[in-house]
A protein has these predicted regions:
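Gly/Ala-rich beta-loop-alpha elbow adjacent to hydrolase catalytic centers
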Residues: 109, 113, 117
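Active-site loop/oxyanion-hole signature of alpha/beta-hydrolase fold enzymes
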Residues: 57, 66-108
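Catalytic histidine-centered segment of alpha/beta-hydrolase-like enzymes
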Residues: 257-270
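Conserved alpha/beta-hydrolase catalytic His-Asp/Glu region
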Residues: 142-147, 161-218
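Conserved alpha/beta-hydrolase "acid-adjacent" motif
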Residues: 233-239
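Flexible "cap/lid" loop of the alpha/beta hydrolase fold
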Residues: 118, 122-123, 128-159
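Conserved HGGG/HGGXW glycine-rich cap/lid loop of the alpha/beta-hydrolase fold
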Residues: 19-77
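Short beta-strand/loop motif that positions the catalytic acidic residue
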Residues: 220, 226-228
Length: 293
């Protein structure tokens, strides 16, 4: 975690089917109650667990948070080859096994992480309390030049300002980029600091070779919050709204953000997640197929 976070956060390297994954565990909160959940958070490609810093600060008081850096990202090791989102879901399950977490969990994911969350809910329904899919590209689209460039650039151009700035332009609102915060500096350093080969392998697996999830969303049994950004130039909000309508126990929320809502609108995103967690205690709120907020 970031240097400012308490020492109570435990960092582990856990062997999975993909690689050794860096896992950050806030532990059981002092104010744990019957409503406390275990939240598992997986970030987007080209970013690590620090995109959730704002959410961790607010949610850890009442919930146990498990944050996972995907293969080739952050402090995690490289995968041995390309991988599927289902394999990522299996890796998440193996992390829970190692941590001896048996109660159903709330899986929260941004983009790549949202795909993992959806696959986890489909393959491991008994372990899934609920799902939060943030800015998640559920459609299997034809390979676009931009996606191919991002994948290739992750291997060969990641040290250049042009590549890193291009990623930032796609991910964040102009106001976020102009802040020049510690987060933005860390975001750039992360891209430049990890292995280009490992990063490119992961980016290709997610952007170019992911499976279609939109056609299977109606098979997710768990309550699901789907958040999309109005200004997401990568994945149009109307397309994601249409896909989310297939969720049988779904909530759709649109926020005035680009691709990473957790960074562009941290307070609003955290509030949406917190409200969703509160509603989990009232399961009748999700009894109607395709419920919307």
């Amino acid at each position: 975690m970031t240097p400012s976070e308490p020492d109570s956060v435990k960092t582990r390297s856990i062997l999975t089917n993909l690689s050794r994954l860096a896992v950050y565990d806030t532990g059981i909160p002092n104010r744990a109650a019957a409503s406390s959940e275990v939240l598992v958070l997986w970030p987007s490609v080209l970013a690590d667990h620090r995109i959730y810093d704002a959410q961790v600060a607010d949610l850890r008081e009442h919930h146990r948070l498990i944050l996972i850096d995907g293969p080739g990202h952050g402090a995690s090791g490289p995968s041995s080859g390309r991988f599927s989102m289902e394999q990522c879901a299996d890796a998440l399950s193996q992390v829970l096994d190692t941590l001896q977490i048996v109660k159903p969990v709330v899986v929260i994911g941004t983009s790549w992480g949202g795909l993992v969350a959806g696959e986890f809910a489909l393959k491991h329904p008994g372990r899934t309390r609920a799902v939060v899919m943030l800015n998640t590209p559920v459609f299997k689209t034809r390979a676009r030049w931009r996606d191919s460039f991002v994948s290739w650039g992750a291997r060969w151009l990641k040290f250049t300002n042009r590549y890193v700035q291009g990623v930032a332009d796609a991910y964040f609102m102009p106001e976020t980029r102009k802040r020049e915060s510690a987060f933005m500096e860390g975001f750039r350093k992360h891209i430049r600091g990890v292995s280009g080969a490992a990063l490119s392998r992961a980016v290709r697996s997610v952007l170019l070779e992911r499976e279609d999830l939109a056609s299977r969303l109606n098979s997710i049994a768990a309550p699901t919050l789907f958040v999309a950004g109005t200004h997401d130039s990568m994945y149009p909000v109307d397309d994601l709204r249409h896909a989310a309508a297939q969720l049988t126990r779904g909530r759709f929320i649109e926020l005035p953000t680009a691709h990473l809502s957790v960074v562009d609108a941290p307070s609003e995103t955290t509030q949406a997640i917190d409200s969703f967690l509160t509603e989990l205690q009232l399961t009748s709120s999700f009894s109607s197929p395709g419920a919307k907020a």
